[in-house]
Every structure is written in C-alpha cells, then in structure tokens.
C-alpha cells in the first residue's frame, strides 16, 4: 500500500521533506535571534550594574572623607581630655602620698594590736584544749552510761515479760476461785466478750480496707500533684520565652544605639583631620594614624602608672581587711568558749537537781513497798486456809524482792538523768483489776468506731478532692492541647517568619561586610587584602537563597507535571471509553520536546486480538499525513475507508468512526 504514489499513507513525501528543512532552518534562525537578544539584554544589565557600582563607590569615598574630618575633631577632643586626666592624675598622686603615710601609721597600730591579740589567742587556745579534753571525758562517760542504759532496758523488758506471765497465772487462779460462785455471770460475760471480740475483728477488717482505699487515693493525689507541677513548669517555660523575646527586643535597641555611637565616632574622626587642600587623602590618613598611635602609647603609660598606684592602695586595704577578720575571728572564738562554759554549768546544775529528785522518788517507792508488805501480811493472817492466796502472796513477795534488787542496781549503774526515766518505767506496773478485760474491750470498740467514722469522712473528702482535681486536670490538658495546636499552626510553614530570617541573615552579612570594608580603608591595607572575606560570605548567602528558590520552583514544576500527567491520563481514559480510541502522544523526530505534533490512535476493539500490538494509526499534524501500521487486512480496510470519507468527502471524524464500526463488526460480533 505504501508503494503507490497516490496513496495518502506515504511515509515522507518529497514536498514534506522540503517543508521540514525550511522549518528547521527557521527554527535555528529564531533560536539565534533569541540568543542575540538575550546577550544584548545581559550586556545592558552589566553596563547598568557597572554604573551603579561606580556611583556607590563615589558616594562611599565622599562619606569616608567626611568620617576622616570627624575623626580629626575627635582626636583634638581626646588631646584635651588627656591633659585633664594628667592633671587629675597628679592630684591623685599627691592625695595617695598623704593616704599612704596615714595608712603606715595605722599599720603600726594594727601590728601592735595584732601582737596583743595573738597572745590572747594563745591563752584562749590553751583553755580551749583543756575544754576539749574535758569534753572528750564527758563523751566517754556518756557512752558508758548509754551502754548501761541499753542493758537495763533489756533487763526491764525481760522483767515485764515475766510480770505479764505472772499476771496471767494470777488471773487463772482468780477465775478458778470465783468459778463456783459466779458461773452464770461468767457465762454471760464470756458471751459478751466473744461478741465484742467478733465486732472488734470486723471493725479491724473494715479499718484495714479503708486504710487501703486511703493509700490508693493518696497515691492518686500524688500523681495529680506531679501533673500539676509539670503544668507549672510548662507555664514557667512560656513566661521565660516571653522574657527572652523582651530581651531580644532590648538587644536590638542596644545594637541600634551602638551603631549610632559608631557613626558619631567616625564623624568625630573626620572632624579632627585638618582640611588642607594641598595634602592627599593618603597623607591625611597616615598623619591621623600616627597621632592615634602616639596617643595610644601615652595612654598606656599613664594607665600603667595609675594601675600601680591602685594596686598599692588595694594591697593596703586587703592587709587591713585581713587583720580585721583575724580580730573578729578571735572575738567569736572567745564568745563561743564562754557560751560552752555557761551551757556546761547549767547542765551540771540540772544533773544535781535530777539526782535529788531521784533520791526522793526512791524513798517514796521503798515506803510504798513496805506498806504493800504489811497489807500482804494482814491478808495472809486472815486467809491461812486458802492455798491459792498463799501462793499469790509468795509470788508478790518474790516480785517485790526482785524490784528492790533492780532498783539498787539502777542506782549504782545509771546516770542521774537516765535513772529518773528508768525508775518511772519500773514503778508503772499493771494493776490487777477483776473487771479490767471487759472495760478494755469496750474502750477498744468505741475507739475503733470513732476511727472508722473519721476514716469514712476523710475518704469522702479525698474522693471529692480527687473529682475536682481530675476535672481541673482535664481542663488544663485540653487547654495545653489547644495551645500546642495553635503553636504548631503558627510555626508550620510560616512564610513571614522565613522571610524575616532571610532578611536578618542578609542584614547581618551586609553589616559585617561594611565593617570589614571600613577597617580595610582605615588601616590602609594593600590591594591584595582589600577584598574582605565577608563579601564572599554574602555572595555565598545570595547563591544559597537563589538555590533555595530554584529548588522550590523545581519542586513546584515536578508537582505540576505530576498533576498534568494524572489529569491527561484521566482525559485519555474518558476519550477511550466514549470515543473508542486510546490516544498516545509521540515525540516528533525533529524536536523531542514537541509532544503534540504526532498522535497514535489504537481502536478499543482491537485489544482482544493478537494483531493489536501492530495495528494502529499515526496522525502527523505538522506534515498533515496519516499512516497505518498493521496487517494487510487492516491496511486495505483503511484504504477503502480513506477513499470514501477523506478523498471524496474530506471527513476524518467519519473515517475514524467508520473504521471503529468495521473493526467491531469484524472482530467483536
């Protein structure tokens, strides 16, 4: 089909080749013209940049000349101040000479006083050593008494245990004696005691349960308090951030003030330089620097002299302060020793008083023991026939004898202060009461009921506090979450803050560059060192900013390409669904970036056949040609339809729809 000359499916006719060559030449000419115009614009921009740089440097030279004049005026002012400082220095030297003489007299007095205080200190030190020895002896005695006290406490506990066992045996004997006469009463009392014991056990259980609840509530309360503390720390951090912002504003204001001072300083330097038209700028600057160096040397010499005098005065003052400190330390030591002496005398008086009281208590206890013995003798005479009472009395007599021996040993071993406490603990013996058990149970029950009520009230209060604190915690947590969300929204992709950061960086770099340029101009550096590093840093920063912009634009372009490809896929799928052809844009052989000149059309109804891989149409918009690729049947079918619809009627859409219908009739139905 491609061999026939009149066929519309020729790959590349001769007229089309001529048109392609003309198109390529025109495209080359347009590209060259565009490059020439871009070079011209770049040349004009470079010329404008050159002119602006020349104007800037001329303005900078004018400003620097003005600054040199102000510096000259400042140096005149500095010379005047130097003369005034010289006169002040002479006056201060005279005053310092007089003060040195007076200080020497004071030093002699202080040395004499120091010798006297040294002697007193040695005397007090010897006394202090004596007191330390006495104190060590007292400590050793105290340790001995403490050890003896511990031994006596152990003996007392053993005696108390024996006393309890004896009381139990005594109670058993009394119960055996009264069992015959009071059986009914004892039965009722036993029942009552059992009931009380059961109630006591129940109350103890409830008490334990309530105690566990209280512990859990206290733990919850501690956790709530910890969360509250965390909240307080977060609020403190927020306040500190606000303070830091205020500090930052203050520092910016101080920076502006310093820059103003810097400008005024340069103006004074310019004023100080004489305006001679005959001299050049370099000679003026050299003269200015020489004067400045001379003034620096003079200032250094005067500063050294002044520092020497100041150090001498400071040394004298430090010696005086050291002497005063030593004197105050000696006085404080004397006062502390007097206080220790007074406290020890008071302690000795107390010990003597306690000794007298202990002697009186011992006599009282002996009298009470004698009375008890007499009562026991009377009872033994009245109840000679009762064996149990005799045993009871013998046991009591043994107990009294043991107590008597214990009291004698305590008198010998215990110190005066510790005897009183031990005698009091030994004298408090448990009384033998018949109805004591019932009273003890009743009192325990009443106490436990009161404690139960108190614990219930505390539990209710703690539960209420827990609820209120939980609500407050929830409110605080919700507020914190809202604040965090707001803070994140404020920080996330904030272009204003980013722009401010970039501006601040450029401002800092420009100010640094300006300072270094001024330094190079003032110090009169060589041409090799005229270009500072800050200029390179500023250019690098500009490059980085441009690179970030380029990266952002590239990201945006890639995002738009993805969106475009996705949308084009959607459109092509819609076209293939409703019009019956899948469309694919092919790059042109002349320009690979041109994707709209050649279109590949594949019928939707050819997808189920093996021929679908090679049966398709290519429509070239620029060359206005149509090419069929596939089998002979497909090409003949296309030829018939082309003669009918394109050559005769010039209707390409009808040709495409007729081709689709014929493919459907042939392959699908």
From Swiss-Prot:
InterPro entries referenced in this protein's UniProt entry, alphabetically: Mad1
One Pfam family hit: MAD
GO biological process: attachment of mitotic spindle microtubules to kinetochore; cell division; mitotic spindle assembly checkpoint signaling
The species this protein was found in: Debaryomyces hansenii (strain ATCC 36239 / CBS 767 / BCRC 21394 / JCM 1990 / NBRC 0083 / IGC 2968) (Yeast)
Role: Central component of the spindle assembly checkpoint.
GO cellular component terms, semicolon-separated: kinetochore; mitotic spindle; nuclear envelope
Coiled-coil region(s): 24-225, 302-487, 533-573
Family: Belongs to the MAD1 family.
Localization in the cell: Nucleus
Name listed for the protein in its UniProt record: Spindle assembly checkpoint component MAD1
Key words of the record: Cell cycle, Cell division, Coiled coil, Mitosis, Nucleus
